[in-house]
């Protein structure tokens, strides 16, 4: 059997693959051995004496199946863990994600005029100070603040209305008393005139 090392190298160059992927027909070794140029190798490829082997199948089916199981929480117990909790899910990354979510929410609320810039600033600093565990708690806090603000405004309006009402009542009472005084003075002066 003749050495076909040259032919294999030329074929791998022509087919643009590794030498392992080149198949030379064992029944036609003499004809292949005569080919010593790329042009002749191309002809042999065209005739089907030299073939590029297909890519070896490396199935990901099992891997996909395991990934789906892991999403459900399987194979993730204490015995399967190698790194520390911080190595598996860094605290800094969790913090960054939380801050970005909270700050995005605050920005949107400010742009939509749901909160004013003063409330935005105080809530921004509170978020930075680790007051809000997640988005839901921040939203609930904002709703509570707004409700308190509305209630205070309502109470203030009611108190103001009560004050104006009492002020007007006092004014009316004073006017009535003044009118009564004037009437009494008039009647007294008339009586004095009649006596004279």
Swiss-Prot record:
From which domain of life does this come? Eukaryota
Q: Where is the composition biased (Basic and acidic residues)?
A: 159-196
Subcellular location, in the record's words? Cytoplasm
Q: Segment Disordered: which positions?
A: 156-196
Keyword list, A-Z: Cytoplasm, Ribonucleoprotein, Ribosomal protein
Q: Name one GO cellular component term.
A: cytosolic large ribosomal subunit
GO terms classed as biological process: hemopoiesis; translation
Q: Which family does it belong to?
A: Belongs to the eukaryotic ribosomal protein eL19 family.
* This protein's name: Large ribosomal subunit protein eL19
């Amino acid at each position: 059997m003749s050495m076909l090392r040259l032919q294999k190298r030329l074929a791998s160059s022509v087919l643009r693959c590794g030498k392992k992927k080149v198949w030379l027909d064992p029944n036609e070794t003499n004809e292949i051995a005569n080919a010593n140029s790329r042009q002749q190798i191309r002809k042999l490829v065209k005739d089907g004496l030299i073939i590029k082997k297909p890519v070896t199948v490396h199935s990901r089916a099992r891997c996909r199946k395991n990934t789906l199981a892991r999403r459900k929480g399987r194979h993730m117990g204490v015995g399967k863990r190698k790194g520390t909790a911080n190595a598996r899910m860094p605290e800094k990354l969790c913090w960054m994600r939380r801050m970005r979510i909270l700050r995005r929410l605050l920005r949107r609320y400010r742009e939509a005029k749901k909160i004013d810039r003063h409330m935005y600033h105080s809530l921004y600093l509170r978020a930075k100070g680790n007051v809000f565990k997640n988005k839901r708690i921040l939203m609930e806090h904002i709703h509570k603040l707004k409700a308190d603000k509305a209630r205070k405004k309502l109470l203030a309006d009611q108190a103001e209305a009560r004050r104006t009402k009492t002020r007007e009542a006092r004014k009316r009472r004073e006017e009535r008393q003044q009118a009564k005084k004037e009437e009494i003075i008039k009647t007294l002066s008339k009586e004095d005139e009649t006596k004279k």
